[in-house]
């Protein structure tokens, strides 16, 4: 089902939102760095999570799917993770597939094994920037080898405690990688943020997850993070929360047509993408927020200016909502989307234009003049999960079918997306396009 044809229809029903990919990465790593056994509940085996599991296994961590003995009949998996304090390199190559989190989290962690290791990947990940780490390698005398700053990357050396200067306007994944490494070194460290920190929510998730596993990091107003050395992570059982960045697609689906209730979204979550609630409220959406669910109904929405610096993953679906909202929607501070799985600003401008939206790229965002209806047509996912899902939701407001090429890009984060889309009334057919 690489290419699919969607017949426009309004969606109605309940969706059990998949677990947070951001929290699943962090929980698996925290458990792996904790001496003893942890059971991590509510896991789906998306391509990115499989990459992190492979990576941790390469570092000598035992991980086993125990769903049948732990929670028989559950749609979601439970992992038994046998962690250890001292990492041992069991495989000298770590394949990160297309997962930026896996790559950037595990590079500094792997240096604790003090053995040469090579990181590989594919797709856009091969060329996504790693300059923050290259600077650290050079400052600390860690050997590394790469061709034109692209994967594969081979590193060999030992990371030492100290001061680490990191720009705040590049990916927070580098900060997370350091936070998963520095507490376990023989000495205290400090991460100093040299520009305004964006995506604070992801850093909050890291600090909170580490704390739940017994590791403390002092946050000095997001300007510096003070980290005591020689800490120990403690094994525990942990349930991964539902994912607001995935829930956002069905939250908007309810706004565009009929009534959708998204389940397993914790209103007290630290996830930055919880911002979807306030953003759609400001746009005039009919939304009801419960303790662990969000319900949206068909609404007349209006354009606003959206600062995406703290919630970049919401931009594709917010662009869809803007395209069918009254007036003008402007998305700003989203320049980092140009170095995601694809250039998401260009992708959304290109693909929404194909189905009749009035949308233009800005250097750091998008400007969208809303229309009541879109027309349908052939679009491409750019092999990006969020583009594929956004275009599926856009079909609700189309007058003709939408054909999405490379639709299985959703496997990166949400393998059951098409099943869930049909569950609430989406009508899809496989579409060969000559294949």
From Swiss-Prot:
TM region(s), chain numbering: none
Xref: SUPFAM superfamilies: EPT/RTPC-like
GO BP: amino acid biosynthetic process; aromatic amino acid family biosynthetic process; chorismate biosynthetic process
Catalytic activity: 3-phosphoshikimate + phosphoenolpyruvate = 5-O-(1-carboxyvinyl)-3-phosphoshikimate + phosphate
Pfam families membership: EPSP_synthase (PF00275)
Subcellular location field: Cytoplasm
Record pathway: Metabolic intermediate biosynthesis; chorismate biosynthesis; chorismate from D-erythrose 4-phosphate and phosphoenolpyruvate: step 6/7
Main location: cytoplasm
Enzyme class per UniProt: transferase
Cellular component terms (Gene Ontology): cytoplasm
EC number: 2.5.1.19
Residue sites binding 3-phosphoshikimate per the record: 21-22, 26, 171-173, 199, 313, 340
Amino-acid positions noted as binding phosphoenolpyruvate in the UniProt annotation, renumbered to this chain: 21, 100, 128, 173, 344, 386, 412
Protein name as catalogued: 3-phosphoshikimate 1-carboxyvinyltransferase
Organism whose genome encodes this protein: Clostridium novyi (strain NT)
Gene, per the UniProt record: aroA
């Amino acid at each position: 089902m690489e290419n699919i044809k969607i017949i426009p229809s309004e969606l109605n029903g309940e969706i059990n939102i998949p677990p947070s990919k951001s929290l699943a990465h962090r929980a698996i790593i925290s458990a792996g760095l904790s001496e003893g056994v942890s059971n991590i509940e509510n896991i789906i085996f998306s391509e990115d999570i499989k990459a992190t599991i492979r990576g941790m296994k390469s570092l000598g961590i035992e991980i086993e799917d125990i769903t049948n003995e732990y929670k028989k009949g559950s749609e979601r998996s439970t992992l038994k993770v046998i962690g250890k304090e001292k990492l041992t390199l069991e495989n000298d190559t770590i394949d990160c597939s297309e997962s930026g989190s896996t790559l950037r989290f595990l590079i500094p962690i792997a240096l604790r094994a003090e053995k040469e290791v090579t990181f590989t990947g594919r797709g856009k990940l091969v060329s996504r920037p790693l300059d923050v780490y290259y600077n650290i390698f050079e400052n600390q005398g860690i050997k590394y080898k790469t061709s034109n700053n692209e994967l594969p990357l081979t590193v060999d050396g030992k990371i030492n405690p100290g001061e680490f200067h990191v720009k705040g306007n590049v990916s927070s994944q580098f900060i997370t990688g350091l936070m998963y490494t520095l507490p376990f070194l023989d000495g205290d460290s400090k991460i100093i943020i040299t520009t305004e920190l964006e995506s604070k929510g992801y850093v909050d998730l890291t600090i909170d997850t580490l704390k739940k596993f017994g590791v403390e990091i002092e946050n000095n107003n997001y300007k510096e993070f003070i980290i005591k050395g020689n800490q120990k992570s403690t094994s525990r059982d942990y349930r991964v929360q539902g994912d607001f960045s995935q829930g956002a697609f069905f939250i908007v689906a309810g706004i565009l047509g009929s009534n959708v209730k998204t389940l397993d979204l914790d209103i007290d979550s630290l996830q930055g993408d919880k911002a979807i609630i306030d953003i759609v409220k400001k746009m005039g959406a009919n939304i009801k927020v419960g303790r662990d669910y969000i319900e949206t109904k068909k609404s007349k929405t209006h354009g606003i200016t959206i600062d995406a610096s703290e919630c970049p993953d919401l931009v594709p679906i917010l662009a869809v909502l803007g395209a069918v909202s009254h007036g003008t929607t402007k998305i700003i501070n989203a320049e980092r989307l140009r170095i995601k799985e694809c250039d998401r600003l260009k992708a959304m401008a290109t693909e929404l234009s194909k189905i009749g939206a009035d949308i233009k790229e800005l250097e750091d965002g998008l400007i969208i003049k809303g229309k009541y209806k879109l027309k349908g047509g052939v679009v491409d996912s750019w092999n990006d999960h969020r583009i594929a899902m956004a275009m599926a939701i856009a079909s609700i407001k189309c007058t003709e079918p939408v054909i999405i090429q490379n639709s299985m890009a959703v496997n990166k984060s949400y393998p059951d997306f098409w099943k869930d889309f049909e569950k609430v009334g989406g009508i899809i057919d496989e579409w060969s396009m000559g294949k």
